[in-house]
A protein has these predicted regions:
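Transmembrane helical elements of multi-pass membrane transporters/channels
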Residues: 20-39, 141, 175, 204-208, ...
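Residue-level hotspots within pore-lining transmembrane alpha-helices
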Residues: 27, 31, 35, 65-69, ...
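Short alpha-helical transmembrane segments in multi-pass integral membrane proteins
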Residues: 1-25, 80-147, 189-245, 302-368, ...
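Interfacial/gating helices of multi-pass transporter permease domains
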Residues: 43-63, 95, 130-134, 194-195, ...
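Small-residue-rich hydrophobic transmembrane alpha-helices
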Residues: 52-112, 149-168, 276-340, 372-394
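Membrane-water interface regions at transmembrane-helix termini and the short interhelical loops
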Residues: 155-163, 183-192
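Helix-terminus/linker motif at the lipid-water interface of multi-pass membrane proteins
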Residues: 34-53, 122-129, 185-192, 252-286, ...
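Short runs within selected transmembrane alpha-helices of multi-pass transporters and secretion channels
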Residues: 141-160, 168-179, 197-212, 292-295, ...
Length: 448
């Protein structure tokens, strides 16, 4: 264990040290999830139900494109952390620099593609003539600055790999605070509606995605990563992308499933269904952010010890993580059931019918929290072991296949409540698969 007060990847991790090291990435993910939540709060309460519905209808498309940065960040940080574990710091920094440059280029390309396809995608997602102008307004502003969104995802992962999770937290909190302040001014006071909400989000993403470039631009004491001459290698870029493909799959699947939910809910409940689902997603974002942040925080540790061939520490990390996730899942389920109505009131307290629908749906939907943490961690664990295939399989089954099947079939079997319970069924089936993958890989990796 390091004699320094700073926790290092090479340390042995007790439960306390593990929680201390992952606290920053957990809070980072929570603040990242706050962007859309804050937009939704001000838009719903200040611009009305139509604007709120439009935001929730088009956001899955924007999120789907932005998650490319998450793919490069998670897959790339696992690769870089493993390289650090092997003792090749120079190569690790050249790989990091290449991934940063690649993210800028890919972000610019997908901004253009995203803008070109915005209208047809909005129509495909079910935008009515009443909703379409609002969808286009919000989407155009965010997609124009998509690169900043992707860079923010990238640097979240690399601050952890650089053993600077608290600094990553600082940038994320600064970005979140910027978003909240600007939303209150542009939407709440100035009354700019969706345009104000989108502008606030873009500026905050620049704080979280562009400002870190200046930090990494020079070598700093105590920071293991810095921007230097990139190692341009399509092979290494492909490896990073394939390693992070599960995170890409997760986000794309969530976006596609969100769109499918919206289409089904429009049929079952009309615009109120989409608005109710939007509130559920906001609550789900925060709770999932805890699991995602924890998984992001532990991933570089797992990658480092995998690179160093330290099987005892891999066993320790897996065992302690399972216990932490179990306790967190029970706490989340209990709190979400007790706070369902107060949470719904924050967003839709102005409409009694919509409030009742949202509260009922939330109490069913939130059962999934006791299961989802294991699946999120399982996928991230295999990413950290540089096994993108298994990680992607878990993500594909959990976030796409099982959810699509459940969304389409459960309402036919048990009625309208099936739409809210679809995610519970999907997580339960995915947990069986995740457990199977963990058992199957025990001899190869030595973590059991």
């Amino acid at each position: 264990m390091s004699k320094s007060n700073q926790i290092q990847l090479s340390d042995h991790f007790t439960t306390g040290r593990l929680l201390k090291f992952t606290a920053s990435p957990i809070i980072m993910m929570i603040f990242t999830s706050i962007y859309t939540i804050v937009d939704g709060f001000f838009v719903s309460n200040c611009a009305g139900k139509t604007a709120f519905t439009a935001l929730n209808l088009i956001y899955p498309y924007i999120q789907m494109l932005g998650c490319l940065g998450f793919m490069i960040g998670t897959g790339g940080s696992a690769l870089v952390a493993m390289t650090l574990g092997m003792g090749d710091e120079k190569r690790a920094n050249r790989l990091f620099s290449m991934l940063a440059v690649a993210t800028v280029g890919i972000g610019a390309i997908f901004s253009v593609i995203g803008l070109a396809l915005l209208r047809p995608v909005a129509l495909l997602l079910g935008a009515t003539p009443e909703l379409l102008p609002s969808c286009l307004l919000y989407g155009r502003i965010l997609l124009t600055f998509q690169t900043a969104f992707m860079l923010q995802y990238l640097f979240q992962s690399f601050f952890i790999a650089a053993e600077k999770p608290k600094l990553g937290l600082f940038f994320t909190v600064a970005a979140g605070a910027t978003n909240m302040v600007l939303d209150s001014v542009l939407v709440g006071v100035a009354g700019f509606g969706l345009a104000g909400a989108a502008s606030a989000t873009v500026i905050s993403q620049m704080v979280g995605g562009v400002a870190p470039i200046f930090y990494f631009a020079k070598r700093r004491p105590g920071c293991r990563l810095y921007l230097t001459k990139p190692l341009f290698s399509l092979r290494e870029l492909f490896k990073a992308c394939t390693n992070g493909i599960s995170e890409l799959m997760t986000n794309i699947s969530m976006s596609l499933v969100g769109a499918l939910y919206n289409m089904q809910l429009l049929k079952l409940f009309g615009a109120d269904g989409v608005a109710a689902y939007g509130v559920l997603m906001y609550v789900g974002f925060v709770f999932a952010a805890v699991f995602i942040g924890y998984s992001q925080g532990t991933a570089p540790i797992v990658s480092y010890h995998f690179g160093a061939d330290n099987k005892d520490e891999l066993k320790n990390l897996l065992r302690k993580s399972a216990g932490i996730i179990a306790v967190a899942g029970v706490a989340m389920l209990t709190s979400s059931e007790l706070l369902a109505e107060p949470l719904a009131k924050i967003f839709v307290g102005y409409d009694a019918g919509l409030l009742a629908l949202t509260t009922h749906g939330m109490k069913l939907y939130c059962i999934s929290f006791i299961l989802s943490g294991f699946n999120i961690f399982g996928s991230a664990f295999f990413t950290a072991l540089n096994n993108g295939t298994v990680s992607a399989a878990i993500s594909f089954l959990r976030t796409l296949l099982f959810q699509v099947v459940s969304i389409l079939t459960l309402p036919l079997i048990i009625g309208v409540d099936g739409i809210w319970l679809a995610v519970v069924a999907a997580e339960a089936m995915a947990l069986v698969c995740t457990g199977g993958f963990v058992v199957r890989g025990r001899k190869r990796y030595g973590y059991l």
